[in-house]
Amino acid sequence: MDLLLLEKTLLALFIAATIAITISKLRGKRFKLPPGPIPVPVFGNWLQVGDDLNHRNLTDLAKRFGDIFLLRMGQRNLVVVSSPELAKEVLHTQGVEFGSRTRNVVFDIFTGKGQDMVFTVYGTLAEMRRIMTVPFFTNKVVQQYRFGWEFEAQSVVDDVKKNPEACSSGIVLRRRLQLMMYNIMYRIMFDRRFESEEDPLFVKLKALNGERSRLAQSFEYNYGDFIPILRPFLKGYLKLCKEVKDRRLQLFKDYFVDERKKLGSTKSTTNEGLKCAIDHILDAQQKGEINDDNVLYIVENINVAAIETTLWSIEWGIAELVNHQKIQNKVREEIDRVLGPGHQVTEPDLQKLPYLQAVIKETLRLRMAIPLLVPHMNLHDAKLSGFDIPAESKILVNAWWLANNPAQWKKPEEFRPERFLEEESHVEANGNDFRYLPFGVGRRSCPGIILALPILGITLGRLVQNFELLPPPGQSKIDTAEKGGQFSLHILKHSTIVCKPRSFN
C-alpha cells in the first residue's frame, strides 16, 4: 500500500468517524434499538465480535443479550433473532416487510446483483419462483426423475462394492457421493450426466464450483463489506471472485445452455415429458419473462444451493450413523423388516420407513446445512418485538439455535432420532413448527425441500441396507468437527468410511 493511499484511508476514517458519531447520536434519540454490545465509531462492533459470525458465536451473543440483539458492523446494522416467536414474525407475520435480501459485495458478483432466484429483489421474487417451480419443485418432477435418483444411488453402491479399499482401510465416500449429486441435478437441469469422477468436464466444473464456494462462504471479506472505506484492501479478493464468476458462467453457457439450445433447434422438445428444466427456463426467456443473464444465474444457483447443501446433509447423516452404530442398526432392521432383505429402497418406500425419516430429520436439526438461513432485509424502518429496526438492516434468523436450544428441546446435543417419533412426532421439515426450520418458511423458504428429502432418504437408505458403515481401523468414531461459513455448516474433515458389504443370501 503506498503512502498516498494510506493518507487517504486515514482521512476517510476520520471523516467517517465524525459522521458516524453524529448519526449515532441522532438515531439514538429517534430509535428504540435492540440491545447489543456498545459500538465504537466507524468499526461498530466489528473489533469486538470479529468477522466470524457463525451460528455458535451468534448463539453465545444471544445468551448475553437476548432473543433479539443488534450488532453494528461498520456501517451496517445486523439484527439477530433467536426465538421461535421472533422467527415467525420475521419469516411469516411480517414476511413482506422483512422479505428483501441484503446486499453483499461478493454475492453481488456471483449473482449479478440479484439476477438469480435466491438473491433476487423482493418485487420480482414471485415471478422468479413461478418460473423455477415447474421445472424443479413439483411432485411431477419427483415422479419424473425419481428413477434416475435411484439409479444414481445404486451406482454409488455398485462402485463402492467394486473398490477393494472400501471394506478394508476405507474410502472418502463423499467423493463418489459428490458425483452422484451432480448427476442427479444435471439430469434434471440438462438431461446430462458424468460417467466418472475423472470426466474432464466434471473435474473442471467441480473445481470452479468449489472455488466459488470457498470465496463466497469465507468470513475474510466481511471487513470490506461492513466498512466500505476499507474496500480498496479487497481489490485482489474481488478481482478473483469476478474471474471465477466469469469462468463459471462461460462454462455453463458453452457446455450446457448453448448445447441444449442446439439440441432444441434440431429436435422437438415440445413434449412436456421430454423437457428438462433448462427447456422450461429457456421458454421463459423466449417469452421475455427473464433475460440471458437470469438463465445463467439460475444455473449458478442450482450448482450451489441444490447440489452442495444436499451433499453436506448426506455427509452429516453418514457421519452420525457411523458414530451411532445402534441407530444405524435400527435403520437397517426397519428396512429389512418392512421391505424385505435385499429389496432396494425406492422413493415410494420412504413413507413406510418412519425411523429412516426420523434419522433425516434429526440430521437436519443437529447439523443444519444453512444454520442462519439466507439473510433477510427490511427496505423500510420496521418494528420487531417492540424495537425499532432501521431500514436496510440485515436480519439473521439463527435457525440452528432454534432447533438446539435446551429450553425448547429435550437434550438437544444428543443425536436421537426417536424424538421425532415420540415427543416431537408432530414436527415436520416444512416449517410447521418455528423451532425447526431447516428449509426456512414463508416467501423466502427453500423450495428444494421437495427434492432434498427424497434424495436424502434414497441415498442413506441404500447405503445402510447394503453396507455396514464403520470408522477406519483403529478409530472408534470419525471426526465431526464443524466448519461454519456465511450461509453454511459442513463437516470440517471429509472422513474415511469403511463400507462392509452385506449378504442377502
Curated annotation (Swiss-Prot):
Molecular function (Gene Ontology), one example: trans-cinnamate 4-monooxygenase activity
A Pfam family matched in the record: p450
EC number: 1.14.14.91
Gene Ontology cellular component list: membrane
UniProt topology in membrane: Single-pass membrane protein
Residues annotated as transmembrane: 3-23
Cofactor: heme
Primary localization: membrane
Catalysed transformations (reactions): (E)-cinnamate + reduced [NADPH--hemoprotein reductase] + O2 = (E)-4-coumarate + oxidized [NADPH--hemoprotein reductase] + H2O + H(+)
Keywords, in A-Z order: Heme, Iron, Membrane, Metal-binding, Monooxygenase, Oxidoreductase, Transmembrane, Transmembrane helix
Residues that bind (E)-cinnamate: 212-217, 305
Record-stated family: Belongs to the cytochrome P450 family.
Function: Catalyzes the first oxidative step of the phenylpropanoid pathway in higher plants by transforming trans-cinnamate into p-coumarate. The compounds formed by this pathway are essential components for lignification, pollination, and defense against ultraviolet light, predators and pathogens.
Name of the protein in its database record: Trans-cinnamate 4-monooxygenase
Originating organism: Cicer arietinum (Chickpea)
